Design a protein with these regions (language model features):
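Mg2+-dependent phosphoryl-transfer enzymes with acidic/Ser/Thr/Gly-rich catalytic loops
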Residues: 2-12, 28-29, 184, 199-281
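Asp-based phosphoryl-transfer active-site loop
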Residues: 9-25, 100
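Active-site metal-binding loops of divalent metal-dependent hydrolases
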Residues: 21, 75, 230-232
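Short, acidic loop-to-helix structural element flanking the phosphoryl-transfer center
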Residues: 26-42, 89-96, 149-153, 205-217
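Active-site phosphate-binding/coordination module
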Residues: 30-135
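Short active-site oxyanion
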Residues: 43-47, 66-68, 165, 224-225, ...
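Short, structured coil segments at secondary-structure junctions
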Residues: 64-66, 74, 82, 186-187, ...
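Conserved acidic, metal-coordinating active-site core of Asp-based
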Residues: 107-109, 114-229, 233
Length: 281
């Protein structure tokens, strides 16, 4: 029985990126890349399952041979990269997003959105990113993955685009905690975080676990053959539902409690270690 647990029939692996697959310096190590390549060569589907938008996914990941699928914006979108096709979506209606902007204005926060596969950020926030306590490597990601626009409300009215995710950054922790408490009470929203000073808003039923399950159904892969690795609050459902749920040693304690296995840290190639532990690669 113990041997059976160590070597399940893993056929689909969902990997969070920041704090999980990538090092703290946002690097994919050669060994981790090699392990992912071995999985894909063996017919195991490996995919990023991230809070990032499509334009924020590093090309060195998507260009790995055989890397076909990606889960974006905490599960709001599942893409088939090979066919350039959306397989599944679970977004916030644009009209509802407009209403939420009025609520967000009551907080001292930077906010922007993911929609149409890209990030959209008002100039007033984009030009002052450094004032919201954002780490340098995240600041760089924000600047390279967002489109600068003058008025988010007008953009929404013109494009009528479903919103994959709303991002918020806070300079003060007390402001973030207040927003987390208050926004968390709104029934049609799911409020999570992946960084020390951010909040991420999705529709209430949107999460990485739901997206993984739907991709599993599309690919005819049962839950028990799904493996998921993560470190943060926004990985909870994915790690909990997976047949093999893996939490990083550097991850949230609540995530470790629902995981089947706690691996090494992201700076110790914990993803590669976990995959080698459970898969014959």
């Amino acid at each position: 029985m113990e041997q059976e647990k160590k070597q399940p029939d893993v056929r689909l692996i969902g990997l969070d990126l920041d704090g999980t697959t990538l090092t703290s310096d946002k690097v994919l190590t050669p060994h981790t890349k090699e392990v992912l390549e071995k999985c894909l060569a063996e017919g195991i589907q490996v995919l990023p399952a991230t809070g990032r938008v499509k334009s924020g996914i590093p090309e060195y990941l998507t260009q790995i041979e055989g890397m076909r699928y990606v889960i974006l914006s905490n599960g709001a979108s599942v893409l088939d990269l090979k066919e350039d096709k959306v397989l599944y979506q679970n977004c916030i209606p644009w009209e509802r997003a407009l209403e939420l902007f009025d609520v967000l204005e009551t907080y001292d926060t930077f906010y922007d959105i993911y929609a149409l596969g890209a990030g959209w950020c008002e100039v007033r926030f984009y030009d002052n990113v450094e004032n919201y306590g954002i780490e340098k490597h995240i600041e760089k990601l924000v600047r390279t993955s967002r489109n600068r626009i003058d008025d988010l409300r007008e953009w929404m009215k013109e494009n009528k685009a479903p919103v994959e995710k709303i991002n918020m950054f806070f300079a003060k922790e007390e402001d973030r905690q207040r927003a987390f408490r208050e926004l968390g009470k709104i029934e049609d929203l799911a409020v999570t975080c992946s960084l020390g000073n951010n909040l991420e808003i999705n529709g209430a039923t949107c999460n990485k676990g739901d997206a993984m399950l739907n991709l599993g159904k599309i690919l005819d892969i049962p839950i028990e053959s799904i493996m998921a690795c993560g470190d943060g609050n926004n990985d909870f459902e994915m790690v909990k539902m997976a047949g093999v749920g893996v939490a990083m040693k550097n991850g949230e304690e609540s995530l470790k409690e629902v995981a089947d296995f706690v691996t090494k840290t992201n700076d110790e190639e914990g993803v590669a270690y976990a995959i080698e532990h459970f898969c014959n690669v």
